[in-house]
Structure formats: C-alpha cells, structure tokens
C-alpha cells in the first residue's frame, strides 16, 4: 500500500491522474496533476511512500494523460492546464533528464474554435506511435473535440503534423 500524500512545490496535494507501465513491465509512471509532477516506482519493489518524482519545469503544465514509448526512452504528457504536450527524455535508469513542452496554440489552425475560453486548449490523453523511422505523439483536445499529431522523431525539434476536429461534440 504505497502512499502518495505529499504536497508539491506549488502547494497543491499530489493527486494521481494518468498512469502507464513502461515497456520493461516493472516501472510505473504516473502524472500527479495538481502538484504538477510525475512520479515513478517499481512494481517488483514498491516503496511505502512515493519517493521518485520530478516537478515540471513549466509551472502550469499540470499533466493529465501519459505515455511511454516502446523502448522506454521517452515520455509524453498532456498538459491540461497550459495547453502543452510534454516531451521528456529518460536516461538508462528511467529517470527523466530533459523536459520540453510543445505549445500547441502556436501551431493549431486559426479557424479552430471551442467554447471553453477560460481553459483554452485542453489536452487530455496522449499516445506515442512509431511508424518506420518516425515517432509521433497524438493528443486529444477535450473541448475542441479534436486530435492533434506532432512528429517527435527528434524530441528537441517537434513538428506539427496534422489535426482534425472530430465533430462529435453535442
């Protein structure tokens, strides 16, 4: 029974939001949305209290969805509060070593519109897809009812690929 009861550096209580098991089948990564952190632990040797965590360098990322690529070297997170996709490189031990953030507002078509002006672009979930020698991150946008795709083959230089509003809103 691992406890997650700490307060983040932003003063908010850590609350698990998204979870993904790494390809090694042992490391669990989770987003801690309100405390603006990501935590991880070993399934084979879970701690009593979550110890391995990192605070996002973007103070308003507040991650929701999370995905780990097939070789466990990259994690993407959906920044629900700030409208970004986090692209984070991992070292050989699985610890995050770089944090990059894709600001989707810079890339989305100007004719896209949705109702929630307070929150704006609100990514919920992310998936990393690999096709040939390319790596992509796909994210869903809650209020726009959209899916957005970025090429992250070079995580340092993400490129907007495509997006579509699904027209499934009420």
Q: What label would you give each PLM region?
A:
Residues 40-48, 88-99, 150-158:
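Short loop/turn segments immediately following beta-strands, especially the blade-tip
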Residues 33-34, 80-81, 140-143:
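Short loop/turn segments immediately following the C-termini of beta-strands
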Residues 36-38, 83-85, 145-147:
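Structural signal for beta-propeller blades
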Residues 1-11, 49-59, 93, 97-118, ...:
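Surface-exposed loop and turn segments in beta-propeller and other repeat-based domains
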Residues 23-25, 70-72, 130-134:
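Residue-level detector of Asp-centered blade-edge/turn motifs that repeat once per structural unit
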Residues 20, 67, 127-129:
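Conserved beta-strand position repeated across blades of beta-propeller domains
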């Amino acid at each position: 029974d691992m406890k997650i009861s700490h307060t983040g550096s932003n003063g908010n209580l850590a609350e698990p939001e998204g979870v993904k098991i790494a390809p090694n089948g042992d490391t669990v990564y989770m987003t801690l949305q309100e405390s603006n952190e990501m935590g991880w632990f070993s399934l084979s040797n879970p701690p009593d209290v979550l110890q391995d965590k990192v605070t996002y360098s973007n103070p308003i990322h507040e991650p929701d969805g999370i995905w780990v690529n097939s070789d466990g070297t990259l994690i993407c997170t959906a920044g629900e509060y700030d409208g970004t996709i986090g692209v984070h490189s991992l070292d050989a031990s699985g610890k995050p070593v770089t944090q990059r953030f894709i600001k989707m507002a810079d890339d989305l078509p100007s004719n896209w519109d949705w109702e929630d002006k307070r929150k704006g672009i609100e990514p919920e979930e992310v998936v990393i897809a690999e096709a040939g020698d390319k790596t992509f991150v796909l994210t869903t946008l809650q209020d726009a009812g959209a899916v957005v795709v970025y090429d992250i083959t070079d995580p340092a230089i993400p490129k907007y690929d495509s997006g579509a509003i699904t027209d499934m809103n009420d």
